[in-house]
């Protein structure tokens, strides 16, 4: 009967549900975790106006409880010191044992978010999962997550899995916002879940792995609002990174090509975004160019941290080429010699790279460096990487520092699909405001990362070998001690003879 209620009655129900303590989930996180933001009730969906400020109300990040130190890995792999820590910009890499898979990661992050904000399970009307970690060619991760909603009786939840390399989470976010701004919206929240396990065979690519998941609650009047009409997208057919071997977790990667594809997509998405925002400004009576100065912060999909620094420098080069000769000389000192170049001719120009990195260093430190905290200490989370960067940015700034700012975001998925978009941060940073609660909810990120167990390269390699051994195996229970997992973590308990997976949760 729930789905047959009028929108007004439905909203009144949700309002009461959030307010009544009797509807608080029975299994809550420890008291220390209950200080995080509780989203307000969703306003009524109207047919004559857009819901205002649709965006991120709350988010949760999950990463595995163990990591391998990249300095130790350099020694173990007999490579020069600094190859991973300096060349890639990585210090630690989180990873999953056989006990965790993409379903368990997503189960964990969704339940952690719902319990922390104490949201009734029937207040979610859309849930979509972005992932490229495929363990079943038919059954979606979303269907497994429906187990969490069973006790509430809420089966009326739209959305399913979205897959294209590291882009699925962003596609899911856009779909959630589009749903909320459409006639299909029933007044409830949307949830976006993105997660992946990034693993590679032994060799040069293995240190660029990682694992994790992010869940985001989407709704109107959000402290991080998606800016409407401001998405620059580029898509094309290319084989830079792909996974055609369904018997293996490992991808086929053309590293040099993938970097060029990433930068080319960045150029084109940024160009499209600039045109759209400049058109909006022109319609509002302001005819001026958009530059990086109009972004207070900038986050990127992060395959490895050095790639991000190079990408911000690339955006500066776009601004440089678009500027007048006088502006080039006055604002972009050290780049004058590159003024006659075309973007498409510069992807392998090392002299330009060095000049750009030097010229953009201060901008990188101010706009982007803080967003790389999780990536530096956990590695590449594929489709959740960009949103891990968002959480890192929030964890390293106060609500007052963020208030009123614009956060640029670049999402890239090999194959390829890419978008450049932006969030507008709420002006209200008062204690107890939605922005203050959202920022506070990320404040324990450094502490949580520090609480993980450091595993030797030898043990890490053995666990990677186990993942190969048990991949698509049937009739087994994963090896390992569940006490090594964080409290409240879901894990794979058993795979039966028909490939059916059973999960359990470590007590909170």
Swiss-Prot record:
In chain numbering, the transit peptide falls at 1-37
**GO MF annotations for this entry?**
hydroxymethylglutaryl-CoA synthase activity; identical protein binding
On this chain, the residues bearing N6-acetyllysine are 83, 243, 256, 306, 310, 342, 350, 354, 358, 437, 447, 473
What CDD domains does the record point to?
Answer: init_cond_enzymes
| Metabolic or biological pathway | Metabolic intermediate biosynthesis; (R)-mevalonate biosynthesis; (R)-mevalonate from acetyl-CoA: step 2/3
* Residues that coordinate or bind (3S)-3-hydroxy-3-methylglutaryl-CoA: 80-81, 166, 204, 208, 258, 301, 310, 380, 414
The reported effect of residue 266 to S is: In HMGCS2D; decreased protein abundance; abolished enzymatic activity
Q: Which InterPro entries match?
A: HMG_CoA_synt_AS (IPR000590), HMG_CoA_synt_C_dom (IPR013746), HMG_CoA_synth_N (IPR013528), HMG_CoA_synthase_euk (IPR010122), Thiolase-like (IPR016039)
For this entry, list what GO says about its biological process. Answer: acetyl-CoA metabolic process; adipose tissue development; cellular response to amino acid stimulus; cellular response to fatty acid; cellular response to glucocorticoid stimulus; cellular response to insulin stimulus; cellular response to lipopolysaccharide; cholesterol biosynthetic process
Subcellular localization, per the record? Mitochondrion
Q: Which residues carry this modification: N6-succinyllysine?
A: 52, 83, 221, 256, 310, 333, 342, 350, 354, 358, 447, 473
Naming one, the record's GO cellular component terms include: mitochondrial matrix
Q: Which one Pfam family would you cite for this protein?
A: HMG_CoA_synt_C
Q: In which tissues is it expressed?
A: Expression in liver is 200-fold higher than in any other tissue. Low expression in colon, kidney, testis, and pancreas. Very low expression in heart and skeletal muscle. Not detected in brain.
Lineage, top-rank taxon, reads Eukaryota
Q: Which SUPFAM superfamilies match?
A: Thiolase-like (SSF53901)
Phenotypic consequence of residue 500 to H: In HMGCS2D; abolished enzymatic activity
- Consequence recorded when altering residue 505 to Q: In HMGCS2D; decreased protein abundance; stong reduction of enzymatic activity
Biological role stated in the UniProt entry: Catalyzes the first irreversible step in ketogenesis, condensing acetyl-CoA to acetoacetyl-CoA to form HMG-CoA, which is converted by HMG-CoA reductase (HMGCR) into mevalonate.
Query: What disease association does UniProt give?
Result: 3-hydroxy-3-methylglutaryl-CoA synthase-2 deficiency: A metabolic disorder characterized by severe hypoketotic hypoglycemia, encephalopathy, and hepatomegaly.
Q: What is this protein called?
A: Hydroxymethylglutaryl-CoA synthase, mitochondrial
Name the gene that codes for it: HMGCS2
């Amino acid at each position: 009967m729930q789905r047959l209620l009028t929108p007004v009655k439905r909203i009144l129900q949700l309002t009461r549900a959030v307010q009544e303590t009797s509807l608080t989930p029975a299994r809550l996180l420890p008291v220390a975790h209950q200080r995080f933001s509780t989203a307000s009730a969703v306003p009524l969906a109207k047919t004559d106006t857009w819901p205002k400020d649709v965006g991120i109300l709350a988010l949760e990040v999950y990463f595995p409880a163990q990591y391998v130190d990249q300095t130790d890995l350099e020694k173990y792999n007999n490579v020069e010191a600094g190859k991973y820590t300096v060349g890639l910009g990585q210090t630690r890499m989180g990873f999953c044992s056989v006990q965790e898979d993409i379903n368990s990661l997503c189960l964990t992050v969704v339940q952690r978010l719902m319990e922390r904000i104490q949201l009734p399970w029937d207040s979610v009307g859309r849930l979509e999962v972005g992932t490229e970690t495929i363990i079943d060619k038919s059954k979606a991760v979303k269907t497994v997550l429906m187990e969490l909603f069973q006790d509430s009786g809420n089966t009326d939840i739209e959305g399913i899995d979205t897959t294209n390399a590291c882009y699925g989470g962003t596609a899911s976010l856009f779909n959630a916002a589009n749903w909320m701004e459409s006639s299909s919206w029933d007044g409830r929240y949307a949830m976006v879940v993105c997660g992946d396990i990034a693993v590679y065979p032994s060799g040069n690519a293995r240190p660029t792995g990682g694992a994790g998941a992010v869940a985001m609650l989407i709704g109107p009047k959000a402290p991080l609002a998606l800016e409407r009409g401001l998405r620059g997208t580029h898509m094309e057919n290319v084989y830079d990174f792909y996974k055609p071997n369904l018997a293996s977790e490992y991808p086929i990667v053309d590293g040099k090509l993938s970097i060029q594809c990433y930068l080319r997509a960045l150029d084109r998405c940024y160009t499209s975004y600039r045109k759209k925002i400049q058109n909006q400004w022109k319609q509002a009576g302001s005819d001026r160019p958009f530059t990086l100065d109009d972004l207070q912060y900038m986050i990127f999909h992060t395959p490895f941290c050095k790639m991000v620094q190079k990408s911000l420098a690339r955006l500066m080069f776009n601004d440089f080429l678009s500027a007048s000769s006088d502006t080039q000389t006055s604002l972009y000192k050290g780049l004058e010699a590159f003024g006659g170049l075309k973007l498409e001719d510069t992807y392998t120009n090392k002299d330009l790279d060095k000049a750009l990195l030097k010229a953009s260093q201060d901008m990188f430190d101010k706009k982007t460096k803080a967003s790389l905290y999780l990536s530096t200490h956990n590695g590449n989370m594929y489709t959740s990487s960009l949103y891990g960067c968002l959480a890192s940015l929030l964890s390293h700034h106060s609500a007052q520092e963020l208030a009123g700012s614009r956060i640029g975001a670049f999402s890239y998925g090999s194959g390829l699909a890419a978008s450049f978009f932006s969030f507008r941060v709420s002006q209200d940073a008062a204690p107890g405001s939605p922005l203050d609660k959202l920022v506070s909810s990320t404040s324990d990120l450094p502490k949580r990362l520090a609480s993980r167990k450091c595993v030797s390269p030898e043990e890490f390699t053995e666990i990677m070998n186990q993942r190969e051994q048990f991949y698509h195996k049937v009739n087994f229970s994963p090896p390992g001690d569940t006490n090594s997992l964080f409290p409240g973590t879901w894990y794979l308990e058993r795979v039966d003879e028909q490939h059916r997976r059973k999960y359990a949760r470590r007590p909170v």
